[in-house]
Curated annotation (Swiss-Prot):
It comes from the Eukaryota. To yeast YMR295c. This is Uncharacterized protein YGR273C. It comes from Saccharomyces cerevisiae (strain ATCC 204508 / S288c) (Baker's yeast). Residues 78-97 are annotated as: Disordered.
Amino acid sequence: MQHFESSDKIEKDDDTSRIKLRSSSLAAPILEAVQEAQPFEEATFSNLQKIHPLTENSTCNGYVIYDKDGNLKSMKDTFGRNIKTPDISNPTRARNERPLDTIRGFEYSITKDPRWLQELETSKLGFKPRPGFAVINQDSQASINLSQLEEKVMESQKKKEKRHISRLSRLLCR
């Protein structure tokens, strides 16, 4: 009996050897558009190149501000405080700013009410939780205060027992 090789198998092997394209070797305009700088980055980078020609990376220094003389100016947030390390997604806020402080900053920029400045928590707490807030326990990974939880569970069980007893007494009294 003769064994014949399938022509499908030969074609599949031939196809895989022909189609070994890598995405890094493709020269598609879409891929170039993904990797090119945004217009605001290009403008910032060209300004930086004029003032400081040794600057190479626009994304690294794209949000640094220089005055007319070429001196470095520190960025300021909505409240006028200096920003030492800007956030990557929003360079007008500090990287370690609390999210509620960001919202308060928006409220302040709209209303100019000084009350928002008094409610800021980043300078007082940093990125630590508020006092009295349940902290994650390192040993059990539970984010609850056990003594408070036990008290709440006991109270809820007592309430359920009272409801159950009152229902039973109503049924028996009828």
